[in-house]
């Protein structure tokens, strides 16, 4: 079941008028941009600042969550946790943020889940198939910005994000019900790589297919399972929403 404390997401969180003539977020607590000396200058880090400012901080201020904590240490991130949300009545959710940063402004109707990648020349399970991770939910992000490439992007360049909060267990259960348990996903991803194929459809499953990246373009050469986001939104516990400087609103359809 979806955590009860997140049901209020279904009501829009509007922006409040700024008496100075601009837009002041409903949940804008005292907040200042991080120092350039200390902030993570990677595209992922910059997107994290945007999410902290326009998503998590608003939810905290509105009482939808008690608090949020961004995990800074590399070991925690490698265990599949970027942000921890605490419910008003206690309890926590560990979120793994996944963003399509190399498809800025593309509004793709799908999302790619990593099955395998190359590490020092060896095939290694990707984040969807890796065992032992702490992830409870994925926060899938389709970002929009004033630029089309992630290199050198700043958090102020982002204009909005369309997000899908996805229950990891619900996703894996749905895949297993389609005959795509972890073992089969890994075998088919490895077979796709060995065969040198770039794409392979899945018989009887029009909402998903396999894609292998070109090793000449991407060093890790991931093999992904691509799933239509309309299907992802239909899974139990899934919730879509849009966050921007203008406010936070639900996305009931993609």
Annotate each language-model stretch with its function.
Residues 7-10, 21-77, 108:
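Acidic-basic catalytic patches of nuclease active cores, encompassing PD-(D/E)XK
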Residues 81, 93, 136-138:
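Residue-level detector of short, conserved catalytic/binding motifs and their immediate flanks
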Residues 146-254:
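Non-catalytic C-terminal interaction segments of nucleic acid-processing enzymes
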């Amino acid at each position: 079941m979806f955590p009860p404390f997140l049901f209020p997401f279904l009501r829009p969180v509007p922006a409040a008028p700024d008496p100075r003539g601009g837009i002041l977020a409903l949940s804008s607590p005292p907040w200042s941009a991080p120092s350039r000396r200390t902030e993570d200058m990677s595209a992922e880090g910059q997107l994290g600042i945007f999410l902290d400012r326009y998503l998590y901080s608003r939810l905290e201020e509105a009482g939808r969550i008690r608090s949020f904590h961004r995990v800074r240490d590399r070991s925690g991130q490698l265990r599949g946790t970027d942000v921890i949300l605490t419910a008003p009545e206690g309890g926590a959710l560990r979120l793994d943020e996944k963003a399509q940063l190399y498809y800025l402004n593309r509004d793709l109707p799908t999302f790619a889940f990593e099955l395998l990648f190359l590490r020092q020349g060896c095939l290694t399970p990707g984040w969807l198939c890796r065992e032992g991770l702490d992830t409870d939910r994925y926060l899938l992000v389709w970002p929009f910005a004033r630029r089309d490439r992630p290199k050198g992007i700043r958090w102020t360049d982002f204009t909005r994000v369309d997000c899908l909060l996805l229950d990891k267990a619900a996703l894996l259960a749905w895949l297993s019900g389609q005959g795509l348990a972890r073992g089969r996903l890994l075998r088919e991803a490895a077979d796709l790589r060995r065969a040198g194929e770039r794409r392979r459809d899945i018989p009887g499953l029009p909402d998903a297919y396999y894609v292998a990246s070109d090793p000449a373009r991407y060093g890790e050469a991931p093999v992904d399972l691509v799933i239509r986001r309309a299907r992802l939104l239909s899974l139990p516990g899934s919730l879509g929403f849009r966050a921007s400087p203008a406010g936070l609103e639900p996305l009931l359809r993609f």
